[in-house]
Amino acid sequence: MLGFIATLEHAEMIGVNPEVAHEHMAGSNFLHAVAQAWDAGKLFYIDLNDQNYARFDQDWRFGMQNIKPAFFLVKFLEDVGYQGSRHFDAQAYRTEDYEDVKDFARGCVRTYLIL
């Protein structure tokens, strides 16, 4: 994808939005994908969530399943001074009420800040 972007007429307007769960579904190393996008100047936005490897899109709370890779991702983003958007693309359980959904979202942010 990054190589293709460089061939576009207005490549400066195009970046990537990597998502933890999508890379895990493919069995890829998310940190490598993020580092490549950062190095190319194309890391515009990032979706933080979690899931088991090689499964359907589960959208679990960030750091819920793979805490060590989540730690190294946060470390990378903070070390390089990433200033772009961090989106927690995670889904609370369908049986949760409004307050539980807010607690779930706070939990995603708390995990990021702890790491």
Q: Where in the sequence are the language-model features?
A:
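Histidine-acidic metal/acid-base catalytic patches
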Residues: 1-115
